[in-house]
Amino acid sequence: MLDFMEYIQLGFAEATNWNRDNSYSSLTATAQSLLDFKTPERLRVHLSSLSTPHFATSYTLGTVGLIDGSVSYLYSTVPFDHTPSRSALIPLRKLAPGYRQVQPPVAPIENWGWDSTLNHETTPLAQKATLLHATMHMPPPTTLNALFLRRISPTMQLTLAVCSTRGPPLSKSAPQASLLTQLSHDTGKYSNEYLFSTDNALFGWRGLWNFGPDPRNPADDAAPRLSLLSAGAEAYYSPVSSLVGMSTGLRFSTLPAATDASSAPSSSSSPSSATPTQISTFPYTLTLTLTPMTGSLSTTYSLRASPNLSFSSRFGFNVYSWESEMVAGCELWRQSRKRVPAEEEDDGLEWARRKLRMMDDAAVPLPPTSSVPAEPEQDETTESVLKIRVDQSWNVRLLWEGRVKELLVSAGVGLGPSSFSSSAWTNSTAGGAGGQASGGGNAGTSYWRGVGVSVSYSS
């Protein structure tokens, strides 16, 4: 489940019309949400608040062997007036990412209201969208994470991320720190990301290309696109450590028009299309990624069988070590509706009417029940999701996320043998699903990986 600050950053991207799907880093986002989800560690409590439309705070307290926690602050020049902040009102599907429906590429909005350079306004609301976020993790060694995000233009975004860790108490050296700079350029048809990290002076580039018509030059009579094929690649180089890395990938996904039969053209004046074509299919996403340097090949297939049920699978193979990885997972959403009687309007005299009915019950006849119109009952809908993930070594993860009263609760458990045979595979594959696979103890002695509960409340 996303924490409150990640949810606010998601609202910032939506408010500034930034497409998160049009990036190479989001190529396998659907499979990662269904297969690489994390379970809570022990007990953790989150208290958050959107104090003003521009300022948010969050506090975290957890027990992982010892008491730890964090304090977070966020400021944005873009007001979050239309972003629900109460934990009872936040849509659960935004906090619990699952199957991610890829949207068709769109051209950047040229008359972007948050760019003072484009509309030549000097009011505070017309300033370029900027977000500042800082998190302090405690206890020692204290770690500070800071984020600076700024929309330079409708097609460009600048991100600065800083991570600083305080040294040992007796050490007189300066705290270790690293800076990651990322410049993103998105035109709808393609996107480029340029990265630089002070850690080993690492340079990087990521790019994604969408096949098909250019959204910047739309045709008036063009039919809605039913699918999207994207190709991308990334490359990294460090002159200090002589580190070289690269990967490439493909993604094929259905678009919302393919899952709605009514959106398909049903008739036309041309004779060739006299027969109605009702096109409707299940939303699905296919990806293929290749890392030539490590010889890793990975394919994923994700399917939304119904609005409340999704499946995903991943198969990986390493041509150098001949090791393979197979992971399968699913998510099941459950909606429960409780009949709640509508609240009657209270004018403050109901207590007096009850007294009169008690005193004159026999003298004053009550009106027939049929003459009094019944108040319609209201439906109170609550959602919850159950995620299950299993790999070829029978390591199982179960995660339940839902809303209890006004609290957001996430409970998970990890099961599996203590030995994990595919640890070498996960170390050689970028973004593998074995991040939590390592466990202690002898093989076969324990099947418990961990259990935890996370409780969140926001206002």
From Swiss-Prot:
**Main site of residence?**
mitochondrion
Primary role: Component of the ERMES/MDM complex, which serves as a molecular tether to connect the endoplasmic reticulum and mitochondria. Components of this complex are involved in the control of mitochondrial shape and protein biogenesis and may function in phospholipid exchange. mdm10 is involved in the late assembly steps of the general translocase of the mitochondrial outer membrane (TOM complex). Functions in the tom40-specific route of the assembly of outer membrane beta-barrel proteins, including the association of tom40 with the receptor tom22 and small TOM proteins.
Q: How does it assemble?
A: Component of the ER-mitochondria encounter structure (ERMES) or MDM complex, composed of mmm1, mdm10, mdm12 and mdm34. Associates with the mitochondrial outer membrane sorting assembly machinery SAM(core) complex.
Protein source organism: Aspergillus terreus (strain NIH 2624 / FGSC A1156)
Query: What HAMAP family does this protein's entry cite?
Result: Mdm10
Q: How does it sit in the membrane?
A: Multi-pass membrane protein
What keywords would UniProt list here?
A: Membrane, Mitochondrion, Mitochondrion outer membrane, Transmembrane, Transmembrane beta strand
What protein name applies here?
A: Mitochondrial distribution and morphology protein 10
Q: Which domain of life is it from?
A: Eukaryota
Location in or out of the cell: Mitochondrion outer membrane
Please report which protein family the annotation says this sequence is part of. Belongs to the MDM10 family.
Give the record's GO CC terms.
ERMES complex; SAM complex
Q: What does the record's free text say on domains?
A: Lacks alpha-helical transmembrane segments, suggesting that it resides in the membrane via beta-sheet conformations similar to those predicted for other outer membrane proteins and porin.
List the GO biological process terms.
establishment of mitochondrion localization; mitochondrial genome maintenance; mitochondrial outer membrane translocase complex assembly; mitochondrion-endoplasmic reticulum membrane tethering; phospholipid transport; protein insertion into mitochondrial outer membrane
